[in-house]
């Protein structure tokens, strides 16, 4: 393997990682412009806590083109 080949593979991997990070930042910025998002998350959290003994609740937001999604992952306790 040539010296350039070794560095080319690393920069390709680095470029992919940078692209994924940029997608994450852009997604966060797009969903940050939704004024009711924080209130919605608080209300969902209150309802889940009312009906379950959840040990873990995680919110994540995604944005693809012009579609924003809010994902909620709830780990239920015994």
Swiss-Prot record:
Phylogenetic placement of the source organism: Bacteria, Pseudomonadati, Campylobacterota, Epsilonproteobacteria, Campylobacterales
Pfam families, sorted: MinE
Q: What does this protein do?
A: Prevents the cell division inhibition by proteins MinC and MinD at internal division sites while permitting inhibition at polar sites. This ensures cell division at the proper site by restricting the formation of a division septum at the midpoint of the long axis of the cell.
Name of the gene encoding the protein in the UniProt record? minE
Task: Specify the domain of life of the species encoding this protein.
Answer: Bacteria
Tell me, what is an example of a GO biological process annotation in this record? cell division
Keyword annotations from UniProtKB, A to Z? Cell cycle, Cell division
What HAMAP family does the record point to? Answer: MinE
Which positions form S-S bridges?
A: none
Write down the species. Answer: Helicobacter hepaticus (strain ATCC 51449 / 3B1)
Q: Which InterPro entries match?
A: MinE (IPR005527), MinE_sf (IPR036707)
Question: What family is this?
Answer: Belongs to the MinE family.
> Would you tell me the protein name for this molecule?
Cell division topological specificity factor
């Amino acid at each position: 393997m040539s010296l350039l080949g070794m560095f080319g593979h690393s920069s390709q991997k680095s470029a992919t990682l940078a692209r994924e990070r940029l997608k994450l930042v852009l997604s966060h910025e797009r969903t940050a412009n939704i004024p009711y998002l924080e209130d919605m998350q608080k209300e969902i959290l209150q309802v889940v806590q009312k009906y379950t003994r959840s040990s873990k609740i995680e919110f994540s937001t995604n944005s693809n083109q012009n579609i924003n999604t809010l994902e909620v992952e709830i780990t239920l306790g015994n």
